[in-house]
């Protein structure tokens, strides 16, 4: 199971992320890995069905509201310069940067996108 995060702006001032869940494995074309690279294009049909196009494949999914949302936390450990400030504790702090309330589930196998193939005469 592969999980990918999409970010957007939420109403509470926090970023609202959407979790994408794919069945199977995604491999990069080159050995550089997937981090920071474009995976594909996410579109919605007029009926609101999410469609993910990855290379020459298309996946249809559905949006699911999570019962218990996830919070994205950033750990902040005070360094030496932070300890010099008066009134600051020396403990580790966690900052909530985003909320994940929905996920897009792609549970079917990808279908190949076939263009017009010229026939040899």
Swiss-Prot record:
GO terms for cellular component: Ctf18 RFC-like complex. GO terms for biological process: DNA replication; mitotic sister chromatid cohesion; positive regulation of DNA-directed DNA polymerase activity. It comes from the Eukaryota. Signal peptide: none annotated. The keyword DNA-binding applies. Pfam families: Ctf8. Keywords: Cell cycle, DNA replication, DNA-binding, Nucleus. It is found in: Nucleus. InterPro entries: Ctf8. GO terms for molecular function: DNA binding; DNA clamp loader activity; single-stranded DNA helicase activity. Belongs to the CTF8 family. Component of the CTF18-RFC complex, which consists of CTF18, CTF8, DSCC1, RFC2, RFC3, RFC4 and RFC5. The CTF18-RFC complex does not interact with the Rad9/Rad1/Hus1 complex. The CTF18-RFC complex interacts with POLH. CTF18/CTF8/DSCC1 associate with PCNA. CTF8 exists as a dimer with DSCC1. Chromosome cohesion factor involved in sister chromatid cohesion and fidelity of chromosome transmission. Component of one of the cell nuclear antigen loader complexes, CTF18-replication factor C (CTF18-RFC), which consists of CTF18, CTF8, DSCC1, RFC2, RFC3, RFC4 and RFC5. The CTF18-RFC complex binds to single-stranded and primed DNAs and has weak ATPase activity that is stimulated the presence of primed DNA, replication protein A (RPA) and proliferating cell nuclear antigen (PCNA). The CTF18-RFC complex catalyzes the ATP-dependent loading of PCNA onto primed and gapped DNA. This is Chromosome transmission fidelity protein 8 homolog. It comes from Mus musculus (Mouse). The lineage of its organism: Eukaryota, Metazoa, Chordata, Craniata, Vertebrata.
